Amino acid sequence: MSSQLAASSPNYSHSEPADSARHDWPGPPSLVPSQVLDTERLMQVAAARSADYRDAQPFPHIALDGMFSDPLLDQAVAELPAASAKWTTYNTVNESKQVCSDASLFGPTAEIIVHALNSAPFVRFLERLTGITGLIPDPHLHAAGYMKVSPGGFLGLHYDFATQRELKLDRRINVLLYLNRDWQSEWGGALELHSNDPITDPRHREVSIEPLFNRMAIFNTPNALHGHRKPLVCPKGRARLCLSWYYYTAPPVPGWAARSKAVEFRGPMDPKRFAIKAANLITPPIVFELARKVKERFAKR
């Protein structure tokens, strides 16, 4: 697993499969999430790169290459859902893109990848890398999942939502996995990270991350201005494709006392049972046996 910030993409192209082919999924791969990621290597990368992440400007972020095997991601792309009712299209002055958040429609390989990044080992990796503890993955992929931007598409600079209203969680981390074979920089689509609005504040700082195949971008949110402003100029039949995950923390509940080390039982006790137990603690068993025999003797009279 490489942790470099930049790498050249493989020298061959990959076009989107035809809609009709996307339905011909193979059987589910013989993999489980724990086999998809090298968890030992994950923790090594987190330990080695945590300072880089936290010190990065304009806000904490990193780009890591080679997090998955290339053939695994190729298979995921081959199983892309058809660009029909399975995709939600957004065409506004702020964005032009398609999204699909239902992992059951992704195909078996991408679904396993989704589960791998929602698993405990990957969450522990994120916590070690970012320094943010108590991270919670979102199995519902609210506003996450596949995002596809076709020629002419774009995503204006924006701040992400701060709270997942259904689960009442605070959004903390974005993870983007790019799936673009042989991507050319002149096509555009680089992820822009900004410190301030470049229009209203000339002092802003900008970092760009190319959306190369098998590259993962991770950054803090929601106070992170990001996007890709310029319309894509990639060839027809190509698109800027990525999978995304969001991670949250739970806000403290007012009035709740922390009880993390033991279960605290409350409620009525059986007085008779409690009295017998207490008596047993201070009375030798032989006394109880003698009392029983005396009681039986008097009962026979």
What is the role of each PLM region?
Residues 2-5, 152, 166-171, 181-301:
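Catalytic core of Fe(II)/2-oxoglutarate
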Residues 2-50:
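N- or domain-start disorder-to-order transition segments that initiate the globular core
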Residues 41, 50-130:
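Non-heme Fe(II)/2-oxoglutarate
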Residues 61, 158, 226:
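Histidine-centered active-site/metal-ligand motif
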Residues 78-81, 105, 114-171, 180-182, ...:
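Non-heme Fe(II) oxygenase catalytic core, chiefly the N-lobe of the double-stranded beta-helix
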Residues 174-176:
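Eukaryotic charged/polar low-complexity linker/IDR segments
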